[in-house]
């Protein structure tokens, strides 16, 4: 088979930067086929996806992807490390992907690889520095950044690298490739003109963060400029039908209710909860009226807002530490969201190489076949996440769309 490219993204929503990334990656790798792994209805920074996973799959297929696979929820709302490992495990399991491409703020993959080597090998000097930084009360990301800067001993070279959201994910992809002894070749594509959190446009480029802000203020002319025509049309259809969820605040009553209902022991059993955070969350839930108020009370130098939001999603979606631990030990299933003619070829080739590969094209058939217990529970979390997600719609808050929605074909 010709060269196959793997890309991991959230596409929340799919914009011109994503289009550039796919086109540039194909050009530089010489790939004929593109497989995209995308997060589903909830995303890595502990928030909702603006539109559902099928709409995002349509956007990707209309703009260069041949096969779109869902990253299971347990990975997609987790830390950068778990997010990357889940996606890399999926791509590895396909046994047909030659190159993995990711966006980055720097223009030098070697710099990211230097950092990934330290994180993978964990030399004693580095871990001692990390422990020291954590004792100062820093959040884990900040403590890790400080420890890496000291260990690598080249502030000028690395200071801006560790502040880039795409760089951080890129480092985790590289680390996951090493951890899984992957044969896939990594390549990076530098972001164009705007960074991940920039809230302004430059020419036809805007970050997904900026587009989501513009959606709240209904700046549709700028949104149209920042997205491929097909993506904008798909977004418009979803908005017109009331099938969108602006952000996590759409579920604030459900989240506060869930935390009030949970015992403190159950809260303590949520991933990322440690060091008395269970007490803070329980007390805040019992006294707060809004999600914003709850987050502002609980977040601190030690516990970032993103970490708090992830924990709130774990509570809302019923994901505990045991499920998270299992996800780190097993290979996920291959949940197909959509494909075109070339994508159909890819699926055939995957199954030719490994007929037992857990490829899901029908959720009902897969659940009825009594598969691996751990994979079944993981898929149940995806289904439940979808059932919760539609509660945020303005209209048609139907459950079980994972059973009724068809695979997107183009």
Task: Cite the ranges covered by each PLM segment.
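A glycine-rich helix N-cap at a beta->alpha junction
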Residues: 58-72
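Active-site cores that bind ATP or allylic diphosphates and position pyrophosphate for catalysis
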Residues: 71-410
């Amino acid at each position: 088979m010709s060269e196959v490219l793997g890309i991991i993204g959230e596409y929340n929503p799919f914009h011109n930067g994503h289009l550039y990334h796919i086109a540039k990656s194909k050009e530089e790798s010489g790939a004929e086929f593109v497989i995209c792994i995308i997060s589903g209805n909830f995303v890595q920074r502990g928030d909702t996806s603006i539109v559902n996973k099928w709409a995002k799959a349509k956007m990707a297929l209309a703009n260069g992807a041949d096969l779109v696979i869902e990253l299971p929820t347990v990975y997609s709302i987790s830390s950068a490390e778990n997010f990357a490992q889940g996606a890399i495990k999926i791509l590895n399991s396909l046994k047909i992907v030659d190159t993995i491409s990711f966006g980055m703020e720097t223009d030098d993959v070697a710099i990211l690889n230097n950092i990934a080597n330290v994180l993978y090998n964990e030399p004693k000097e580095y871990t001692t520095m990390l422990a020291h930084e954590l004792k100062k009360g820093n959040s884990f990301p900040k403590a890790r950044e400080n420890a890496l800067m000291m260990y690598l001993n080249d502030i000028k070279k690395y200071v801006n690298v560790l502040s880039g959201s795409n760089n951080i994910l890129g480092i985790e992809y590289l680390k996951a490739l090493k951890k899984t002894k992957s044969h896939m070749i990594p390549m990076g594509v530098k972001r164009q003109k705007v960074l991940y959190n920039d809230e302004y446009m430059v020419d036809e480029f805007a970050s997904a963060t900026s587009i989501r802000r513009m959606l709240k203020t209904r700046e549709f002319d700028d949104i149209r400029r920042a997205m491929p025509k097909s993506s904008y049309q798909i977004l418009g259809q979803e908005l017109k039908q009331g099938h969108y969820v602006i952000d996590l605040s759409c579920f604030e009553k459900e989240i506060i209710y869930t935390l009030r209902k949970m015992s403190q022991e159950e809260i303590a059993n949520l991933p990322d909860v440690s060091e008395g955070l269970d007490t803070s969350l329980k007390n805040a839930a019992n006294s707060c009226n809004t999600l914003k108020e709850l987050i502002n009370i609980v977040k601190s130098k030690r516990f970032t807002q993103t970490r708090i939001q992830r924990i709130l999603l774990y509570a809302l979606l019923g994901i505990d530490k045991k499920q998270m631990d299992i996800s780190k030990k097993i290979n996920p299933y291959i949940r197909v969201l959509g494909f075109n003619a070339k994508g159909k070829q890819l699926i055939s080739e995957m199954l030719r190489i490994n007929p037992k590969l857990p490829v899901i094209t029908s959720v009902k058939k897969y659940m009825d076949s009594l598969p691996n217990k751990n994979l079944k529970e993981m898929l149940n979390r995806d289904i439940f996440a979808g059932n919760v997600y539609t509660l945020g719609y303005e209209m048609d808050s139907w459950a079980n769309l994972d059973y009724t929605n068809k695979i997107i074909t183009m």
